[in-house]
């Protein structure tokens, strides 16, 4: 058994290669092999968002605070709120982030395949973000 106490792991700033705007990542768990699951609480300041990306085994988002937007490639920008759970299928190109006026916090859970949990791509343009 392992208990990870809240606040026991340092926060990290979301790197500008992967995010637009101010993003804080608070690691929750990252299990060693043979497990492959990891998770973090991610907080986006208003207007902040991920770059386009995919996950080899998919990703689950659990919205805990604020208001945000998500979009899969070719689909509409959709609003998410606390209590919403979003599933992105393996290989589904997508982005997620805060709405223009509201902070968003969600828990992100994904699994690694051959040591990789995410494939980062190009930044979401302002036009794409605005839908």
Give the positions of each predicted feature.
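A short, N-terminal "cap"/entry segment at the start of jelly-roll beta-barrel domains
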Residues: 1-37, 117-131
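Conserved short histidine dyad/triad with adjacent acidic residue
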Residues: 24-27, 38-55, 90
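Conserved strand-loop elements at the edges of beta-sheets that form or border functional pockets
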Residues: 30, 54, 62, 80-82, ...
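Short, conserved beta-strand element in jelly-roll/cupin
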Residues: 41-45, 54-70, 109-112
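Short beta-strand His + acidic residue motifs that chelate non-heme Fe in jelly-roll/DSBH
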Residues: 50-52, 70-71, 88, 93-100
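A short hydrophobic beta-strand segment most commonly corresponding to one strand
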Residues: 60, 87, 101-121
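Short acidic-glycine-tyrosine-enriched beta hairpin
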Residues: 74-91
């Amino acid at each position: 058994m392992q208990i990870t106490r809240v606040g026991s792991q340092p926060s990290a700033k979301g790197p500008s290669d992967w995010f637009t705007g101010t993003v804080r990542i608070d690691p929750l768990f990252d299990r060693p092999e043979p497990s492959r699951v990891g998770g973090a609480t991610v907080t986006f300041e208003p207007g902040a968002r991920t770059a386009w990306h995919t996950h080899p085994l998919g990703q689950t988002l659990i919205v805990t605070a604020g208001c945000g937007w998500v979009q899969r490639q070719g689909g509409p920008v959709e609003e998410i709120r606390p209590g919403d759970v979003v599933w992105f299928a393996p290989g589904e190109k997508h982005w997620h982030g805060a709405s223009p006026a509201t902070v968003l916090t969600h828990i992100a859970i994904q699994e690694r395949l051959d040591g990789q949990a995410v494939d980062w791509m190009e930044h979401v343009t302002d036009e794409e973000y605005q839908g």
